[in-house]
Amino acid sequence: MVIQGKRLAASSIQLLASSLDAKKLCYEYDERQAPGVTQITEEAPTEQPPLSTPPSLPQTPNISPISASKIVIDDVALSRVQIVQALVARKLKTAIAQLPTSKSIKELSGGRSSLQNELVGDIHNEFSSIPDAPEQILLRDFGDANPTVQLGKTSSAAVAKLISSKMPSDFNANAIRAHLANKWGLGPLRQTAVLLYAIASEPPSRLASSSAAEEYWDNVSSMYAESCGITLRPRQDTMNEDAMASSAIDPAVVAEFSKGHRRLGVQQFQALAEYLQIDLSGSQASQSDALVAELQQKVDLWTAEMTPEFLAGISPMLDVKKSRRYGSWWNMARQDVLAFYRRPSYSEFVDDALAFKVFLNRLCNRADEALLNMVRSLSCDAYFKQGSLPGYHAASRLLEQAITSTVADCPKARLILPAVGPHTTITKDGTIEYAEAPRQGVSGPTAYIQSLRQGASFIGLKSADVDTQSNLTDALLDAMCLALHNGISFVGKTFLVTGAGQGSIGAGVVRLLLEGGARVLVTTSREPATTSRYFQQMYDNHGAKFSELRVVPCNLASAQDCEGLIRHVYDPRGLNWDLDAILPFAAASDYSTEMHDIRGQSELGHRLMLVNVFRVLGHIVHCKRDAGVDCHPTQVLLPLSPNHGIFGGDGMYPESKLALESLFHRIRSESWSDQLSICGVRIGWTRSTGLMTAHDIIAETVEEHGIRTFSVAEMALNIAMLLTPDFVAHCEDGPLDADFTGSLGTLGSIPGFLAQLHQKVQLAAEVIRAVQAEDEHERFLSPGTKPTLQAPVAPMHPRSSLRVGYPRLPDYEQEIRPLSPRLERLQDPANAVVVVGYSELGPWGSARLRWEIESQGQWTSAGYVELAWLMNLIRHVNDESYVGWVDTQTGKPVRDGEIQALYGDHIDNHTGIRPIQSTSYNPERMEVLQEVAVEEDLPEFEVSQLTADAMRLRHGANVSIRPSGNPDACHVKLKRGAVILVPKTVPFVWGSCAGELPKGWTPAKYGIPENLIHQVDPVTLYTICCVAEAFYSAGITHPLEVFRHIHLSELGNFIGSSMGGPTKTRQLYRDVYFDHEIPSDVLQDTYLNTPAAWVNMLLLGCTGPIKTPVGACATGVESIDSGYESIMAGKTKMCLVGGYDDLQEEASYGFAQLKATVNVEEEIACGRQPSEMSRPMAESRAGFVEAHGCGVQLLCRGDIALQMGLPIYAVIASSAMAADKIGSSVPAPGQGILSFSRERARSSMISVTSRPSSRSSTSSEVSDKSSLTSITSISNPAPRAQRARSTTDMAPLRAALATWGLTIDDLDVASLHGTSTRGNDLNEPEVIETQMRHLGRTPGRPLWAICQKSVTGHPKAPAAAWMLNGCLQVLDSGLVPGNRNLDTLDEALRSASHLCFPTRTVQLREVKAFLLTSFGFGQKGGQVVGVAPKYFFATLPRPEVEGYYRKVRVRTEAGDRAYAAAVMSQAVVKIQTQNPYDEPDAPRIFLDPLARISQDPSTGQYRFRSDATPALDDDALPPPGEPTELVKGISSAWIEEKVRPHMSPGGTVGVDLVPLASFDAYKNAIFVERNYTVRERDWAEKSADVRAAYASRWCAKEAVFKCLQTHSQGAGAAMKEIEIEHGGNGAPKVKLRGAAQTAARQRGLEGVQLSISYGDDAVIAVALGLMSGAS
């Protein structure tokens, strides 16, 4: 080697050839061997395993020998047992060390035949021969035949796939072996063993770097060494010492050598720069540096002069996209009126007249014709139903009178302003309390004005022009008196108000402006999401008709924002307003800042309150001039102050306020008087504002010194009066100066004065506390007083109870008994479908937790406990040292009351609708493939032979393949022209927010084993957990208990899905495409019915039907409809219904392409938080927010529920599904479900409420057939609502309600699909509005519209299930949750007068019935009608209700205990591992309809007994073919209703039905003699059917007797005086004698017409009594 012309003495020149010395040229060396050390190994085969044996390892440089003390590890070959262990562990996803060899494949696979089959196939492929039935052989016995083997096909392929799919590109098999050899000293055979161990613990994804790969292989080596019992030590540890000793090269030589290399590199760099024309002189860099230095100097100057806080304070924030609008005053009016008439109590209005007057004023300001009609309608209805409520009559009358008198008036701000003043008291214990107390000597509506007149200079108004000495104070006071009597109207006016934060004077003025009907634009310096709730509530409480409130974020300390704000107001593309007035009340506090402390914050406040006020006014002038407006000056109310430095320590505040007074003179000296008018407002001491709250306790003392203090409402009125037309006109004549200081300026040194007053109050409080302490001390020492020593009391820590939440049992006397006379025995419980259990799993956790948020907006303490458990933050322990909750991570005890403080923030951030937090789905990094054509040959890479062959098949001539040193591997080169797919990551922000399950939720908390968790799709786990909870909700602590009451075939499963399990579907399609390894049984979990199958296999084991509805977003309602029909048809007695769905990246992308989901990026740009993005029915809605989870209900036949004592949450009165019209758009919303309300003419049948209470006439609205055609059809026990579906004169919806004695007016709640999409949210209300109008719902009685998806997002399939759960909770609690995200209701929905959209939760007295509506893509529409359970109970006799109550109390108490125990022990899901019967008994049990399960009292287990089957009591079965009394009553009542409308006035009707099968009285000679005439007997005996003849005559006699409406002499009275003759034309005739004839004459009947109809099993007769002169 030569350096600078000198040959190194220690070197020699070698001539190398590339063909012969390739290794030396590439610096590859053979592995060195320590001299004198012989490696000791066991006998091993000379040939190494094919895949595991690389070409000879690269030779390492011979730097230093290994120390002779190094431990040598024997190189041992693999055993067959190890290979089998690895293959099994890989399939079971278990570490090899955790896999016992004492078990067989069958045992380890848990009985899964598909897994056994797969493992046996892998082992067959691995070894040339294996024993028979390998699945039954213990793993350790696989090594007997051949103790040392090589890797076979299966294991070799697994290792190859591991390396190709999970290792970095530069970390191939050779690199892995080299690392294992160099670092750990492992020989080739042990290297192969490590590779084998790795296939059982693959990394989840491709490792990013070689260092990560080395760390992974180090971990695998450690696991291998631990399983083999050997100790591994890195070889570097033994080499360090020798390596350091071997360094013999002179450092100077090395430095000289490096210097020469650097010089050569610099020369090459310069040559390349010259060729590429790159300037290396640094001139451009110098220019850049100079520019940077200049800019830095300017920045430093700005920072030094203005301070960082000033620069931060002037940053612009105006963004009109973030503005919020509130304007749906008409919906607020509906909400207030409807809530008033449905409230449970009127005591609030009785006890608080002021609150009621405020309420009346609010409604008067919103009064229109629609509201007046609504009030009249509701008051008529409520007169009968609520008249007993104290205070109702007076309140209702006053409300109607108030609305009637103001319906045509403009809205007016009617300020109720009692004269109150500050009052400070000090309690006995020395606590200082402040309150507002009435002022003395004044009263009435104008008491405030009276109090002002008491002081000569409390307020004043005069001209600010020195040339005009006019005093307008008296005019102002007179106008204020008039305003307090009549109100102030601001209709048609527009205002801009800045500084209207909570509790401010500006906010008080805004309230008055809204009450007066004005349009107001308010600026806020905070993000809209943090202030929207406050301004929404302000508008809800004060917005009058025609009013509008807009809120826009704006930094008025920014010059850019000042200009942008005014441009937005006047721009035709913006608001296009011309301001009537501006109130620039924005201010900045600058406490404790004296003159020598002036800083950037002070200057920022000066800019905000003075400089930028001038800027805003100047921009208004510019805009008005540009628009040519010179005759409508904008009034400016300048916020002046008496503080001209008298307070001190407030920065530039006095100077800013004082400088504004210059505008009094500028208006004359400058040119803008045609555009602006000026009115200065000197604001005095205003209590309870941000600046003065701390001084409230001394305000009373201040007033004693002749100073008047004002409340916020009083000051707001003062200011608002200046905006009325009279004073606006005065202001246009010249500037006004309003003094509302209350003589505050007369005080001297205010700081000292205030400090003295504070000190005085504090001293008084301290004296009282000291006196009290002294009194206690004296009492303790007084004679005869024994000191009492109290032991310290341990602090109480409240505990929260985990409860299921069972429904309230209605009070029989108060709620059920009033219904019983008209409903008892009206409906057979066997013909009713009831909901006995429900559950859900969604973004808020369980149904209980979702309801707390939906109805109250916050969690209870019990809710926090449940959520913390569900999110795996806490767990329950029960041992000798502690019983209770502990932190999951630390194990530290956690009290129930501490959970909110410890985990509240975490829970809030990881529940509900939020940015997606899933580990498997990152929308910000969505992976897609880009097809790329290779333009240049790519470098070679190594793959297996199979992969190389596959690549040749795909790329043909565009791929080059050559052998490598490894016989099972090849070197592959992709050549120019090859087409490859390159993965790339793109952000999919559109769908980056969703309603995910609470973070930390795991099915393991419910008791599902880990192997099952990894085996099935997540949606299956959701469904299993929900089904288990639904049974607890039904009070069923073990699902198998139901089979004590029903047969195995009578429980159905109708849980559906829109897309099934996406995780397994993705594995089946995408992972296969990527050549990733997938489970062998992945296909089975892609079917939509598989979760239901898992539910049956793991929990139920029933033989009932599994039907899987697929209705897109309407899947849930389709499932309910299927379950309802199944029970009504008698196919099942109990059904699981509901739906499940998961979040799926591909589906989210598809929804985004349809523009159905909300664009999260745009929503964030508009200032919306994730929780605000789902806004059903709102004017600003922009699409739905996805969610996922599961919802389940347990439906049951009514008699079974009574028999079992199950809690009844609701009655499913009816359901319907409908398609839609012809079209070409699958997702288009439709109106086919209108057919649920189909009827030709509104039913004229008598309501059940107006009928007599006798059984024969207790019927609700029933089928309106024109004539009786079949007695059999009448006696059919199917429910009348179902029979009515086939009629034309009664809608199925009406019939469903009529079945329970309800009308269309009794629907109280409509749960809307309400997805927050443009199309659905207009179509759905239109459908319901059309239905209500068609069915004749009384105008003015709107339904409460619930939009649950504002809280949950849209979960697709479970949507209707969650909605139904919410409806059940509404029925139970009487609470109607509001849509808190509804800022402004879409104006198009104003015409939906039958709907009211609440924005807050409303408490109702009761909810009778609900209507649930759901829609889905693909022409799916459905509705469900539900009825409160008290109507079901009212059909039962009281003893039966009371017996049921006893049963259900026992069941629910046990259910609560069992559920709490299951949560604490993590055993909510009870997995069944075997059938509850012996296998030989299965056919007998399946075939025996009376087979029932029984419980072993000793073990508590449920089993079918082999020796006996419980028999059904024959007495419980009615005689075949005999109609029940209920059916007879229904039939008679139906005919009576159909006949009565066609009768003459005063006519009578009688109906009777006689079953033929039970009519045996004709065989009794005495009966025949007493009741039939001779001619009747002769006719009957000659008839072909003697039984039918006698029965028809008896039936006719009974009908005639009823027609006569005479007093009965008892069931034994003879009927011979009523004779039925056989007419010549075949029609029967009635002949009356004796008492019967007398009764007819007394009733005024001229005659009786009779009709007799015969059926196969019954005879029915109808008798019509005709009045004299009637036809």
From Swiss-Prot:
Q: Where is the composition biased (Low complexity)?
A: 1244-1270
Q: Which residues carry this modification: O-(pantetheine 4'-phosphoryl)serine?
A: 113
Q: Where is this region: Ketoreductase (KR) domain?
A: 492-729
Q: Where is the composition biased (Pro residues)?
A: 47-58
Q: What's its catalytic activity?
A: acetyl-CoA + n malonyl-CoA + 2n NADPH + 4n H(+) = a long-chain-acyl-CoA + n CoA + n CO2 + 2n NADP(+); a fatty acyl-[ACP] + malonyl-[ACP] + H(+) = a 3-oxoacyl-[ACP] + holo-[ACP] + CO2; a (3R)-hydroxyacyl-[ACP] + NADP(+) = a 3-oxoacyl-[ACP] + NADPH + H(+)
- Pathway as given in its UniProt record: Mycotoxin biosynthesis; aflatoxin biosynthesis
Ranges for domain Carrier: 75-153
Keywords for the protein's UniProt record, in alphabetical order? Fatty acid biosynthesis, Fatty acid metabolism, Lipid biosynthesis, Lipid metabolism, Magnesium, Metal-binding, Multifunctional enzyme, NADP, Oxidoreductase, Phosphopantetheine, Phosphoprotein, Transferase
Query: What is this protein called in UniProt?
Result: Fatty acid synthase alpha subunit aflA
Please tell me the species this chain comes from.
Answer: Aspergillus parasiticus (strain ATCC 56775 / NRRL 5862 / SRRC 143 / SU-1)
Tell me the organism's taxonomic lineage.
Eukaryota, Fungi, Dikarya, Ascomycota, Pezizomycotina
Give the gene symbol: aflA
